[in-house]
Amino acid sequence: MNGFQLLQCGLSVAAFLAGSALAATPAVYPSPQQSKFTSQTVAFSGKPSVTIRSAKAGGSKLLDGVPEKSGAYKLVISPQGKVGIGAHDERGAFYAMQTLRQLGTKTGGEGVILPVGEITDWPDIEFRGTVEGFYGTPWSHEARLSQLRFYGQNKMNTYIYGPKDDPYHSSPHWRDPYPADQAAQIRELVKVAKENHVDFVWAIHPGKDIKWTEEDMNNVIKKFEMMYKLGVRSFAVFFDD
């Protein structure tokens, strides 16, 4: 039984790892809190599956020792070729799958070899990510998409959008809606961030020309409402420089 919509029981290990750039020597990064492996390995074809358990699904031994915090998980690979994941939320299950990807090495064909053992891991730092908040040419849309996927693969959870030379984030157009093409890009960034369990934070930088009036206070709120319609759910106000 799986308590999450993110991943379904019966997910093929080989299918999940297909197309991944698997390392010749597996390594988990960031380094997990606890790990215990034997010298054994197990080979997978398309048949083995992943069982994911959550407290909502009734719990199991897969949750033993897993702290109740976002992103925590346990990953168990048995000598019999069974893969189990215990997590309290979708982010934890997602991170466990990233660890599984890091542990896999390809055989000569389409199969995958995994080490036998278990990992219990959880984040020490609540907010893990970057701020795109510099002056100069902002990152391209493609670079941002690549960054968001990289964050998910490496278990980071925060991206703050605040490039100072975006005139719709800063002056002179922070009060105005994004043009349609740029709005569509924001929507896609939010979507990809969600897929990778990254919190997309959109920041406004109004300090160059804001007027300390009720009108401009309402303009800030209106801009946040515009961004909300694009899918943004986390916001920041920058007065750093």
Model-derived features: where do they sit?
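Phosphate/pyrophosphate-binding catalytic cores of soluble transferases and nucleic-acid-acting enzymes
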Residues: 1
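Gram-negative bacterial Sec-dependent N-terminal signal peptides
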Residues: 4-21
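Acidic, contiguous N-terminal accessory segments
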Residues: 8, 22-91, 99, 106-120
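Feature activates predominantly on carbohydrate-active enzymes
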Residues: 70-240
